[in-house]
């Protein structure tokens, strides 16, 4: 069953015409937000795959899940189909399951974090990032076994879960 979005405000968004200059300013602000996502991840990453090989991909998507800025396409649709809980303000989602996001991540070493963005109780966008973790408990160091017969030999397979709710850690996963 697909995810259910919980909004505390049901007021419709107002449509507004935007001139080309304002649109260009908004576009560049969104691209800058994505570059800032890059900078934060590079400064804080513990994984050499992210820190040294730049194997990570931040993305901002609109409320339908279509990529607005990024470089790898959107995986929101697949994630929402695989996650059977609610999406609420303050949630942060995590998955390492390539089958749970239409293959946007290619193996268990890629960890996907997804944050729905709300304004005044309404979902307006998604911010997401996935990056390559060096070792996630697979049968060989580095968790990239060339002779794996099933996905569980790569390491810990985390289905789509809500890691935080209202910015507090979700007890079963901590």
Regions found by a protein language model. Give the residues of each.
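Regulatory sensory and allosteric helical modules in signal-transduction proteins
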Residues: 62-70, 77-102
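Long, charge-dense accessory insertions within large macromolecular proteins
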Residues: 2-77
